[in-house]
Amino acid sequence: MAKKLAITLTRSVIGRPEDQRVTVRTLGLRKMHQTVIHNDNPAIRGMINKVAHLVKVKEIEE
């Protein structure tokens, strides 16, 4: 089965640069401690790397 990623917003985007805010929103995260599920692909991994200090990532098998 394909791997998926559970991405949780753990830190606020208040006071962060606009590009980081846009990246968090593009991942589908709106509120603190919200978790979204995405397929594991290079585009999503790149977005995670850009805001790694704001999110927590867990790999899940489905």
UniProtKB/Swiss-Prot annotation:
PROSITE patterns attached to this UniProt entry: RIBOSOMAL_L30
Record has Transcription as a keyword: no
Organism field: Geobacillus kaustophilus (strain HTA426)
Assigned keywords, A-Z: Ribonucleoprotein, Ribosomal protein
Coiled coil: none
Descriptive protein name: Large ribosomal subunit protein uL30
Similarity remark: Belongs to the universal ribosomal protein uL30 family.
Subunit structure, as described in the record: Part of the 50S ribosomal subunit.
Matching InterPro entries: Ribo_uL30_ferredoxin-like_sf, Ribosomal_uL30_bac-type, Ribosomal_uL30_CS, Ribosomal_uL30_ferredoxin-like
GO MF term list: structural constituent of ribosome
GO cellular-component term (any): cytosolic large ribosomal subunit
NCBIfam families according to UniProt: rpmD_bact
Gene3D superfamilies: Ribosomal protein L30, ferredoxin-like fold domain (3.30.1390.20)
Domain of life (superkingdom): Bacteria
SUPFAM superfamilies given in the database record: Ribosomal protein L30p/L7e
Biological process according to GO: translation
